[in-house]
């Protein structure tokens, strides 16, 4: 994101940005019902890098799938560009554990601007204390 544009977004409210998008024909460009884990962070800003989860089949999605380095969740964590916000679209399913403290820490080390989910996080008590 260009620095001059970033400075504008840093001072604009979410409502203002949503209205501007709406005027451009982009409706429903936000996720409802979100709340920050860390209440001390006032604003998170970055381009979106989105991963969409689909419901897992318990007969096919065994724990071994997470050992695969090409698992979509791992790929997203490694490919999310610096200064982007990783968005986990979990279809508003809190049982879809989007990530835990290890992956969130990895994203932080890689320079990710933040993480958003409409699902759940494992280790949320640890994630909210990650600096």
Spans of features found by a protein language model:
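Feature captures the catalytic cores and cofactor-binding loops of soluble hydro-lyases/lyases
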Residues: 1-131
């Amino acid at each position: 994101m260009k620095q001059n544009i970033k400075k504008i977004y840093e001072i604009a409210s979410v409502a203002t940005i949503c209205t501007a998008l709406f005027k451009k024909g982009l409706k429903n460009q936000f996720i409802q019902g979100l709340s920050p884990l860390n209440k001390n962070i006032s604003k998170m800003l970055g381009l979106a890098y989105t991963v969409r989860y689909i419901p897992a089949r318990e007969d096919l999605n065994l724990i071994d799938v997470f050992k695969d380095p090409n698992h979509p969740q791992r790929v997203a964590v490694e490919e999310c560009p610096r200064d982007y916000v990783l968005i986990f679209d979990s279809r508003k399913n809190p049982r879809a554990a989007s990530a835990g403290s290890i992956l969130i820490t990895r994203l932080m080390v890689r320079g990710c601007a933040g993480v958003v989910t409409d699902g759940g996080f494992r280790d949320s008590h640890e994630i909210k204390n990650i600096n």
